[in-house]
Amino acid sequence: VSLGSVVTIGDPREIDDNDVFDRCIQTLAPWRKGPFRLFGRPINSEWRSDLKWERIRSNVDLRGRSVLDVGCGNGYYGWRMLEAGASSVTGIDSSLLFVLQHALFAQYIGNQQAILPIRLNDFSVQEPYDVVFSMGVLYHQRNPAAHLDALSKLLTPNGTLVLETLISPTKLAPDQRYARMKHVQIPSIEDLYRDLEALGFNDVDVKNVSLTRTTEQRSTANMPFESLAEALSGQNALETIEGHRSPVRAVIIAS
């Protein structure tokens, strides 16, 4: 088992029926987050999630801390959080497919990371978390301020919020689509500072701002559908097909 940049389970020499895992990987497609390797079989996900994690991991200390990952997907980041020293990781995501993808690996790694198939609005806890992550979730919310408020209430008094989101120079809420996505609201950095400080976060710091490139989000054998390239203008890769600025993402740490 390796929880490094490619989350890896097993060696192909350990198994007799090589087709079983090929069928599992194919049945559970599309794979959005990764990369993984399962008994020698690479799972090449749409997102190079290892690149995002590189932008985050040096900016937050997870050693001995309890972690909640909201909108966790298939748990790729949760395994990386455990590698970084988290004492426990709980993920929530409403997609049953992602929960099943996680289960495929968890049966070999162990139950160090739990993923619950529920939405944030339905999630309640007895013990708050030291660190709460929300990555790639905020701009999909109909009420982004309420999302931030809900996250803040899941933290210990000295807890840390890790927010990763699309950003725009000014708030962007297209009537139609943005990069083919419906119902998005993309905040500005100023919006995020204001909303987080209003919730009582005294230390809000932008740690990274990055243009999302087609080397990081793309179609693969394990996610064969259209991806970022098809959402960008054929004449100008710095614009979406709708004429908006192409995706730029920020990492914000608030405490």
Regions found by a protein language model. Give the residues of each.
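Short alpha-helix
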Residues: V184-G200
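Conserved SAM-binding loop of SAM-dependent methyltransferases across substrates and taxa
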Residues: N74-G85
